[in-house]
Curated annotation (Swiss-Prot):
One Gene Ontology CC term in the entry: cytosol
Protein family membership: Belongs to the peroxidase family. Peroxidase/catalase subfamily.
Cross-referenced HAMAP family: Catal_peroxid
Pfam families referenced in this protein's UniProt entry, alphabetically: peroxidase (PF00141)
Biological process, per Gene Ontology: cellular response to hydrogen peroxide; hydrogen peroxide catabolic process
Cross-link (Tryptophyl-tyrosyl-methioninium (Trp-Tyr) (with M-244)): W95-Y218
UniProt entry keywords in alphabetical sequence: Heme, Hydrogen peroxide, Iron, Metal-binding, Oxidoreductase, Peroxidase
CDD domains noted in UniProt: catalase_peroxidase_1, catalase_peroxidase_2
Active site (record annotation): H96
Official protein name in the record: Catalase-peroxidase 1
Amino acid sequence: MQEKGKCPVTGMTKHKTSGGTTNQDWWPNQLNLKMLHQNPTMRNPMGERFNYAEEFKKLDFEALKNDLYALMTDSQEWWPADYGHYGPLFIRMAWHSAGTYRMGDGRGGAGTGNQRFAPLNSWPDNVNLDKARRLLWPIKQKYGKKISWADLMILAGNCALESMGFKTFGFAGGREDIWEPEEDIYWGQENEWLGDKRYSGDRELENPLAAVQMGLIYVNPEGPNGQPSALASGKDIRDTFARMAMNDEETVALVAGGHTFGKCHGAGSATHVGPEPEAANIEEQGLGWKNSMGSGKGIHTISSGIEGAWTPTPIKWDNSYLDTLFNYDWDLVKSPAGAWQWVPTDPTAADSVPDAHDPSKRHAPMMTTADLALRMDPIYGPIAKGFRENPEAFADAFGRAWFKLTHRDMGPRTRFLGPEVPTEELIWQDPVPAVDFELIDEDDITGLKGKIIDSGLSLSELVSTAWASASSFRGSDKRGGANGARIRLAPQKDWEVNQPEQLQTVLQALEKIQDTFNSAQSGKKRISLADLIVLAGCAGVEQAAKNAGFDVCVPFTPGRTDASQEQTEVESFSVLEPMADGFRNYSKGKYTISAEKLLVDRTQLLGLTAPEMTVLVGGMRVLNANYNKSQQGVLTKRPENLTNDFFVNLLDMDTAWKVTAEGGDMFEGIDRKTGELKWTGTGVDLVFGSNSELRAIAEVYASDDAKQKFVEDFVTAWNKVMNADRFDLA
């Protein structure tokens, strides 16, 4: 007889794919190395050879836009369009796709199509956006691999604006879809929707978060924690939008521009609304929030709980939002769903807004508490009034802010695809000059390497400077990196981690080599300082390998240029300053998060794997490239020799490790037999012997037959970091 609960084919216990106690349950503080291996090719149905950029170039862009325009007014019975136009719904979808971006760590945003997956597809703030994506499905189905979901959602928002009379600033494609939820994005510590444990002290929001509550994109529209105070809401809005890289003018333009269109939905109590998509029954086929009130759609729709439109013309671009905001005084009321909102005190406004589905009905406009902040806040108010008096300035500001919102996480313009990419260079895109000179060749590279090695700079100085320049890159929003040589500019030149005094010495020596080389050229051949910094690091690695007995050539590809201070927004770049860099054994202060976890986080931002992280840390230690030449973790008697000594000595069982007398994250390696001090290290060093997964990798590099493999793997990982921002090489 078949044993109960067993699979009749394999005998596997049922529910093996879910439930059960996981390693993370047993050991909650365990390092999450999965975040270093997200979206592997085996999860991607497009295959390893798929090139999205090439497929996008084959797209009939105008035909796609025409199909999107047609969809805007093709109301479907299963989810009828408000006012006969889906435009406002698609604007909200695009906005909420892009609006998860936060500049603190560059994560979130529209660049991956992650709104399709948990948790975002089930956030309270994204109620009924599942319907927007289903409305888009026939178009996605038609164009297939030529347009990603990530690009399509943003383009749909643009087409929505255009179909309602707004001229957009532009559109760029190039967002490639992911195929599973991200492991690396910290959305908050709360374990219930709309929780706000992220605040401490005097309403200080936890970094790097930007949204005020779990499951919201920005702020609570009813006011902080649902309390209807416009002034308090203004403070929340300013903090949140600033963390999403928007200044006050951009914030007012975005809110006023976005709320020019559509309406909010709160026809009845939230008790009518069923579970979100991830919790819905299988027969719902990925749709959530099934509504038991009336028809469950149209006039009975329940989304935010707020009910009504902002303007008399909800599907037309005009100044009516600002006119409505300033023309009336406002009374606080509750919506049919019980949410706080505001309506005009003037009774003549009661029939100024059309009904979204019944032409025989009229309504008063409404405003949320967050809307009133644009009028009541002492900074936002004058900006909003100025936009009201100058509609052209308002339209320009909204167009630019919308483009920034929807493209902020895409990185430099070299990644932008399509016929509608704006020609204007925008400061937030971190521009670098175009290459207007002849690049150096192999003979030049060889000669320059010799000059660098003979310059008097130590190998550790060459390596640490190149690392400082290139490792500023973060793959989340494609910012930073060696291109531009911004390490010589504010703010990077003054970052503590970059050792400003040593940095200036190295830069002066390299600039002298650069000037000598460029002055000797009769033609247009030049080397940029950005290239020379990287080349110097490569020369240092090569020499260190040679010192260890290995003859290797570290790859180098010229083509970087030098940005100016005018092309560098200091405040914007300040968020790239590392609070910790385990590769250099650096920490700016003491944090509640362990140094090991910060190392993994930085590794993920650099786009590195666990083996690459391991080999780089081991190599940087023996190259003596620590911050301030600290000897923590320099587990070698042969510094500046590219050996596997770090791993050999870390895993040596003749050494016992203990916390130093000072405690904290400092450790001493003691000879078990003599009791003598052999080494010192940090948690970042010891984790490669402590963590079982990292130890498994470290054992590979500590093996007797791995000396050459270590060098080769270090060079490969080094080259990856040096070229992390070279999208022109892709």
